[in-house]
């Protein structure tokens, strides 16, 4: 190939000296079993070299600030462009980072509001403008020719001067008249002793409307004089009906001076825009709404406010109901149905959004408080302030000398929405600025799909369009990219730290599209994670868009649709670990060769139908269950869901439909608390019911690393290494030398090499180049002192055992009759990890391998207490062949009396479940409903479910 990336002799990790050519400007999928060497080729070879070469081209000064990549171990790589890796990691934990800021959409929104936003007075609803003489001329010429009018300005009296003295100065300056109570009179004839300056204006000029050049020039001069004399204010009074028009060169209206819009005014990361109460975080430490009202399905009358229960505290509930029901508060309405104004009424004592003119000031609880004019104040309110939850806790604060009050305050304290900005993070002034009748905080609260529709429908004046056209184009494009990658359910104010790995990766993908880079190498790690089959087509379209810009797009992927849509397919195998690392296929994705020998490539076998994951012949029956009632956290719509026990349940639905909220935030946390274990506060729900006595433990199994340190390895995780160390300590030479089991640990002093602290390698820091990792000169990479290595068992020392694979170790310890060690290692073999070495660092394991190590740990546990295992997308990083093994491990857990609840999009797993719970129909606000539940065959018949359509194909129910 002429235009290609050429790799010769790649030997990174388990790659077997491979050489291959990869075409440029194509969509390439690298696939293979978990642990076969896909990431070693894509990230540790291609990305490392592409990034290293780019960084090497920079100055030594710039290089010291950038992450330095190791030079991959290979003979040469030719034709590689600068590389960008988009991984499945949540890249930020910064609480200030949101979807809007990370995609740069929020920066463009700030610019839009700063340039074309209109400030609207909250008092009268009129637009706040800084007037010019052109506005004055425009107002005057809008009347009929010949209409007489006065040019007026307010009379300003400097400190230390009387009205009479000021009028005398005006007269000496050439002004002859003033207007008082609508009447024009001469200054020299005016009696100023009883005059009210509020109703008095200086007459600058008397004119008639005319479009002639001289008349307009005179009006402009008079307007400038009026602005000067009036301190920035002036008026036009039209005759004969006395119509008055006010103008101000100050940015004010209704007696309030407003801040002029600027882009920093809308930034919660700038002191100019951040809410002063929460400093732009949107949350403060205060009274937690969810602790005060844990069940939002209840009304105030039905004891929704838990701190108002009990003999003494229930007085507050009675007072609130007695007085506020008369004022119009809906005491029988469930809390979740209350409007924001009604919630503010309950919390703060007065409905929000009331016009100031409808309020009067009253001294309540020792403070001046604005209250609605028509309200009658009761004695309790005079003592404590307006009856509300806030007033109740203020009463407790005042009595903090009582221990019961301090306990009560501590019980309800937590992170809560900032009462000043209501979680918007911005100063209240930012909400006065509108574009198309909406504030910036309203826009970032909309789901991306709804915001895109609103932006498309937005109409601006030609002058505004001239300023904002480019900004609008950027916003619309970026919103479209987010929709294209299946994230239309997210809002722009969603914190980045709350996103899943898949969502975070697809946001980075959308941001990359927005940057329109060309001629680069993009390497993506399973972008389909967390994506429903419905949205895979959209993702493929985005990947092809990225390719069509002139980029080379390499995707490490297991999704069948993405494999078939690729231009080029690279399969690495045949197995995993030391049995992998070879190129099994490197060629066009379509058409696939039909004549390759069965068993040489698992990928081609599955894609051509020679291998399949079979549908179970029958589903397990169940009677016992756990039920969550009234689940209402995030977007869930008060649903009741049953989770059967001792079977495999899959929770399905499109991205953002509420699966993680239901399973992780409610079921897992509620079960942990039910078992009296420490857990985060469960998401909002009414109750957890069912056969709870049958559940003795709950475990959440994710793909996070089992240990981030290079010392951690799978054999220590499953507790097999402890037994192996005891075995070596029991050998005659070890006993003779007084060695304990601790001497055979590379983590503690005694037997390990102290030069490298048991690592086997020494890291040499290089200032401008990648750090060098060299074998330890003292132990030659063997991690232990020489005298420890002299202790052998079956002819092998401790280093030899660490170098064995799981399969070799099982064979070795079986031959030497060590059933306990074999029993601890066997589960690792059962979950398909027989290829990894006993001493292999956990940091080198893939996400799928990490999860299977955890599975092996649970399979090897001796206790058989019925446990609920919760898995969040366990097929991430797993090939079709790995999924078969995973399902075998799942079945082994169920046979031991355990329960499995799995959040999953993979149809091969869903079709093998005993029970499916499908949420939807869409993501975000349009999701959160229970569409259907039952056996896969029953769910496949559901008309409203996207899952059903794809499940029907997998079950051959056409």
Enumerate the language-model features and the residues they cover.
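Conserved phosphate-binding elements of NTP-dependent enzyme cores
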Residues: 1-958
